[in-house]
Amino acid sequence: MGQKRTMTLNLSEEEMSSLDQLALRNDMSKTAVIRKAIRIYLTLEKRMQKGEHIFVEDELHQARAELLLV
């Protein structure tokens, strides 16, 4: 991973609460959650730049929606 750097992150109460919940639910540190989110975002962005489409699917209701990064 290389040399680590420190940064200050300003989040709203709602965003901080979401981060806390994700960390707790997944038994991860907040830093690990943010790192994972960055990796996921980069993966999605790279695939979309190649012209690929990302979908979420609800098999129970036979519904599918395209994920868009805005």
Positions of the model-derived regions?
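Short Lys/Arg-rich basic patches
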Residues: 1-11, 65-69
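Short acidic/polar alpha-helix capping motifs at helix-coil junctions
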Residues: 6-7, 18-19, 60-62
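Short, positively charged interaction helices/loops
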Residues: 44-70
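Small-side-chain structural scaffolding
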Residues: 8, 23, 31-33, 37, ...
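Surface-exposed, Lys/Arg-rich phosphate-binding patches that contact polyanionic backbones
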Residues: 13-32
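Aromatic-enriched hydrophobic runs in primary sequence
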Residues: 22-24, 40, 44, 58
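Short, basic amphipathic alpha-helical segments that act as recognition/interaction helices
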Residues: 28-50
